[in-house]
Each structure stands twice: as C-alpha cells, then as structure tokens.
Amino acid sequence: MSVGCPEPEPLHSLPCCGPGAAPVPGAGVPLLTEDMQALTLRTLAASDVTKHYELVRELGKGTYGKVDLVAYKGTGTKMALKFVNKSKTKLKNFLREVSITNSLSSSPFIIKVFDVVFETEECYVFAQEYAPAGDLFDIIPPQVGLPEDTVKRCVQQLGLALDFMHSRQLVHRDIKPENVLLFDRECRRVKLADFGMTRRVGCRVKRVSGTIPYTAPEVCQAGRADGFAVDTGVDVWAFGVLIFCVLTGNFPWEAASGADAFFEEFVRWQRGRLPGLPSQWRRFTEPALRMFQRLLALEPERRGPAKEVFRFLKHELTSELRRRPSHRARKPPGDRLPGSLRLEAPGPLKRTVLTESGSGSRPSPPSVGPVVPVPVPVPVPVPEAGLAPPAPPGRTDGRTDKSKGQVVLATAIEICV
C-alpha cells in the first residue's frame, strides 16, 4: 500500500458477495477478483489532523470504531469520518461497504460518500455526507408514531431507494429506522445508509446470531449451517415492519417466529384463520391492511416489490384510533391465542443490532464503556466540489440508545463470508 500520499484514491467497485464473484448483468457494480485487497489505501498519520480538518464533535462510537463530524478547513465542508477498527473487520469487508455505497450514490435517496478512503495504523476510514437531523429512529414518538403525512414522505423516498437497489440486483439486508438518515425532522429529505450487509441477489450467506423484529421469517427459520440465498424479499419484509413502526411507535412483534404470540396471531390472520383483525392492526384502514398483506406476505415469492407501496400512499393509512394513545398495552379479553400466557405487547421501539459469531465479524454494540482507542480524524483533501454531497447533513453512523444507554454504531454487521 502506498504510504503518506496526500491525495486519496478514487473509489473502486468491489465484489458484493466475496472474492471472485461473477458479474451480474445490469447490477451496475463492477466486480473484481481477490486482487481487491491490494487496492491502494493511503496510510496517513493522525498527527496531521489539524492541518486539514477541524474536529467538530464525535458523533458516536462502539466496540468496532467511531464516527467523527469534521470540517475541511479549506472550504468548511462538513463530513462524517467513519473509523472502523482493523481488529474488528476484514479489509475486504470494509472495501466492499465503501464500494457498494459509492456505486449506489447516484440515487438521491441513498447516502453519498466522499472520495476519501484511507487507513491509519489502527483503523480503516472513509467519509460520508453528514445528515444533521440524525436518523429516523430519533424522531419516532414511542407508542405514538409519526404523523401520517411525515410517514408517507419518508416511505416514498425509501421505496425509491429500495427500488433503485433492487433494480441493480442488490439487497440491503438491514432495513430499519436506525439506517435511515434525515436531513430534516419532517422527512422531506431522507436517505438510506449502512451497506455493510448488502449482497447481491442469489448470494448464499450465513444466518446471523439472533433476530430482530425486522428479520423476515424465512431468515429466522434458516439453519445456521446451511444459511440461505439472499433475495429482495427480505428487504420488502423489513420495509413493511418499518412502516408499521413509524406509524405506531411500536414493534408488531419481537421476532417473526412461532415462539412469538403476536407474530403467530398475525400468521393466523394472513392465512384467514383468525376472525377479525389482530388487536395491534385494528388502527389501520383497509388500503393499509392490503399494503401490509403484500409487504408482509409469509412466502417471499408472494411479496410485492418495494415500489408497490406507492399506490397505497394516496389513501389514508390509519383510522381515528391512530390519534388516541396506544391501545396495545394489553390485549383485550378474547384476543389471546389459545395456550398462550403472554398478554403484554412487544412494547415501544428500541434500537436493534444483529451480530454474527465467527472471525472477522463485527460484535454487537456495548452497553456502556469505552471503545478501543482509535485515532482522531485524519487529514485528507476534501473532494472536488462536484463530488461533495449537497450541503452535507448529520450523523451518518453513530448513535446512542437513549433507552438503555447503549452506544450503537450504525455500520451494518458483516455476515457473508
């Protein structure tokens, strides 16, 4: 690798499913071979930081790195420098995330990266545009949800981001509010971020350790040894759960598995075996319920494409119940599933993270405590004006879990080996 060169290399496109992956027609992501690990990353000394960059503040940190908001002294341009600890990630995984993010940056609904990629002695580093309003999770009132107009603006943009990705045969695999960055708190401008788990359609991946409410049932059921083939349906499912969350301020279930009473009730409704609606779905209008039936179809092949939500957005999604305090604290008598002792609803939203056991994987964020020390922002010339993101906005990767004091770094967990 080149050492001490002041100019960053242009961003390269890398395999999204491991070394030597075959090209995907129309995918828009040029694929290289194992030589990707020989790509030049500029090695820079942290001592030069004050020469080019001003540290504004730390945006977040975790066991595998940190994110700093910096300003380039020459122009005042703000950017988020993302430091990934070398002891917690492989070079190929870091380069893959940067490459995929760059390849998708032509979409106005996907976070952009600056032409700044380098390494320090302890970290790999790249720069993203800064989203000043934080992430979508930050603005969702627990057990209340966002105003419907705000939700529709957000859903429209996310649908376009997913449609763009899926048209290139890429699957995000970690759709959730924490990975949607905001440029204003009314969701007039939002962008999808965090592509560390992104893989192309058909790529076979290992199952993660544990599940989160956004995880599709076929992923929950996949064997750890066999894994599963990546499909756009996992994004569509997570998109449906996300829409439920932003409208209600609650999860629909804790996990899409038979052990969850609320998911089982939903399954019975989807299969026409439940008279009436599950209690937590009664606030939605008929068009909204049809939308959820499509997005959350139990069989992946029956899920509609993400862009199908557009035809439902012209309708009201929630009824008058939406304007009342959450009525999900307890299920009404008679709504309990046979043989189930569980009465409490899944509860208000909380931040979620996936983990994978095995070398090279990124661990779950710590409850509290210091992170392995990482260098302060390193001087790299700011990109040309034409490459800089428009009026870059706030946090791109770091965030704090307000409910539990957890520090969460938004980089998605590496899963595919």
UniProtKB/Swiss-Prot annotation:
Instruction: Please tell me whether the keyword Ion transport is annotated for this protein.
Output: no
* Annotated region (Disordered), positions in chain: 321-405
Localisation per UniProt entry:
Cytoplasm
Domain of life of the organism in this record? Answer: Eukaryota
Question: Which intervals hold domain Protein kinase?
Answer: 53-318
Stretches with biased composition (Pro residues): 363-382
| Catalysed reactions, as listed in the record | L-seryl-[protein] + ATP = O-phospho-L-seryl-[protein] + ADP + H(+); L-threonyl-[protein] + ATP = O-phospho-L-threonyl-[protein] + ADP + H(+)
Q: Where does ATP bind?
A: L59, G60, K61, G62, T63, Y64, G65, K66, V67, K82
What the entry lists under PROSITE patterns is as follows: PROTEIN_KINASE_DOM, PROTEIN_KINASE_ST
User: What Pfam families does this protein's entry cite?
Assistant: Pkinase
EC id: 2.7.11.1
Give the main localization category: cytoplasm
Instruction: Indicate the family of this protein.
Output: Belongs to the protein kinase superfamily. Ser/Thr protein kinase family.
Its function?
A: May be involved in signal-transduction pathways related to the control of brain development.
Q: What is this protein called?
A: Serine/threonine-protein kinase SBK1
Q: Which organism is it from?
A: Mus musculus
